[in-house]
Amino acid sequence: MKNGFTITQRNAVVEQHLWCIDTVMVQHAAWMQAAPIDPDDVYQSLAVRLIRAVNSYDPCKGYLKEYILSQLKREMVRVRSTQA
């Protein structure tokens, strides 16, 4: 971990930013309705990416929220590309 969070701190940060997953899913709601994909699978992929984003976050490179949202959007692109 670049940020020095303990596991407990990391988990708390992840819980505080779960709303980011919902935000990204709402932004891609039209695609999710049109694609044959289970929203629970998408949520799980985004949740794993959220944990990884918090683990790899470097405070010297910007705000945590922006980093998390960019990582979740990248994960959504990856999920979409696997459905093509």
Predicted regions and their residues:
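Alpha-helical promoter-recognition and RNA polymerase-docking modules of transcription initiation factors
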Residues: 1-84
